[in-house]
Amino acid sequence: KVPARSVESRILDIAGKLNISDILNKYPYQVSGGQKQRCACARAIINNPKLLLADEPTGALDSHSSQMLLSTIQSINEQLRATILMVTHDAFTASYASRILFLKDGEIFMELRKGNDSRSDFFDKILNVLTMIGGGQSHVC
């Protein structure tokens, strides 16, 4: 059993990282769609999972909230050595990954690995692949 003090500390830490501290005592009908999405992410990461499945995790978020969420997911990956399988159509979101599989017509079209590239350089490579395969017609995983 986890001590209550430890649970409370973890909740406050994650809520702070996802900018949802001010809604912890609110009912679902009192919060926005983006806040609900960030709460769902908090639920997914609260127990330090070894595998995190993220399907369009930034879909309902504004750019600031998206960046905060992606930074949190990235720190989970680094600190907990968690594997994160993320599906996204957004090149910026994909640039936070270390490895990307591009799907086209239900098959793997290409793989990119970040390696030692900066996120900005990796983002440019992602855009180049998307241009090569027709932009929005593919999925980035």
Short names for language-model regions:
Residues C41:
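Hydrophobic anchor residue at the start of the ABC signature
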Residues Q67-Q79:
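Helical segment within the ABC ATPase nucleotide-binding domain
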Residues Y27-V31, Q35:
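Conserved ABC ATPase signature
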Residues L52-D55:
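Catalytic Walker B motif of ABC-type/P-loop ATPase nucleotide-binding domains
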Residues R5-D22:
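Conserved ABC ATPase "signature" region
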